[in-house]
Amino acid sequence: MEFENKIKSLPIWKNLENIEHLEGGITNLNFLVSDSGSKSVVRLGSDIPEHLVYRSNEIIVSEAAYQIGVSPKLIYNEPGVLVLEFIESKTLEPKTVRENLNKIVPIIRKIHDEIPNKLSGQPQIFWVFYVIKYYSNYLLNNNSSHIFINSKFIKKSRKVRKTLLSKRNCIWS
């Protein structure tokens, strides 16, 4: 009810018809909202600094992704709230991912090639190797019970990075 009230209070609605909770969302809650015959997705979530999740970055990247044609239009945002156009779609299952790799890979390539050119502002980095290093330091500095996996994980990360960097035209430098 608290989330529904938050959604209802947003100043963008003309004739709010329905709010439906959507499954999924690892670090946020998602809702499908019907308003005046159109549908939007409302994402509610806060920053999670220990996991390098900053909602302000989602806004910057969402705008860039929309500009290159791989994401819905950002309709509205405020702290903790992101509203996007709804796109009728189906969540891919592992089998459908495998069956459609020839369509998926070019989209991922486009994301990595074109989004960096469209970014504005100063987004925090969410680069996989930096994140691994960050988590490693976090485990060390907080005397984590998971510290035993740390050195093995760092070694694997360095090996993967080195392999990727050795590939021609690598975009993950």
Can you name each region flagged by the protein language model?
Residues 6, 17, 27, 59-60, ...:
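A generic local structural motif
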Residues 21-127, 131, 144:
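ATP-binding pocket architecture of kinase catalytic cores
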Residues 14-22:
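Short secondary-structure junctions
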